[in-house]
């Protein structure tokens, strides 16, 4: 639990700084409120790590191209090569739900089902994003 909570806290702190930036480095503080975040903590079966990485990179790249997806970050806990954290930001909960209906998401879930030893996800609404 501590590992997942510390990963969550670190990721949220790092990502909050990036959340308010639009392409070209323009700030979007007013647009950040109301956005929707999906944060996922994952422990991967060690023997499946490389296959998992290929699958999540493919899914993340496709997700980032979806209308309504602001970012899709794939992070690895440095002290544990098999512990990953996904940080996904969408314009709305509806955009997140649309993501879960895409062919690439369904493919990712089908391929990685047995690769994941533990999955814990949280959905959150952005109240405010503060960054310099």
Residue ranges and their predicted role:
Residues 4-34, 74-80, 109-132:
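Glycine-rich beta-strand-turn "strand-cap" elements at beta-sheet edges
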Residues 35-43, 73-100:
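Short, well-ordered beta-strand segments in beta-rich or mixed alpha/beta enzyme
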Residues 31, 99-106:
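Residues at secondary-structure transition points
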Residues 48-70, 104-108:
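Short amphipathic alpha-helical segments
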Residues 28-37, 41-53, 90-93, 127-129:
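N-proximal accessory regions
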Residues 55, 75, 99-102, 111:
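Residue-level signal for well-ordered alpha-helical positions
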């Amino acid at each position: 639990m501590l590992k997942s909570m510390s990963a969550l806290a670190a990721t949220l702190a790092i990502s909050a700084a990036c959340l308010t930036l639009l392409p070209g480095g323009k700030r979007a503080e007013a647009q950040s409120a109301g956005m929707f975040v999906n944060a996922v903590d994952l422990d991967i079966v060690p023997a499946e790590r490389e296959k998992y990485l290929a699958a999540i990179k493919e899914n993340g790249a496709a997700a980032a191209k979806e209308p309504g997806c602001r970012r899709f970050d794939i992070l690895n806990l440095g002290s544990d090569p098999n512990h990953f954290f996904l940080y996904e930001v969408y314009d709305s909960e509806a955009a997140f739900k649309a993501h879960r209906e895409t062919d690439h998401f369904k493919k990712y879930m089908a391929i990685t089902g047995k690769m994941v030893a533990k999955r814990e996800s949280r959905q959150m609404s952005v109240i405010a994003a503060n960054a310099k």
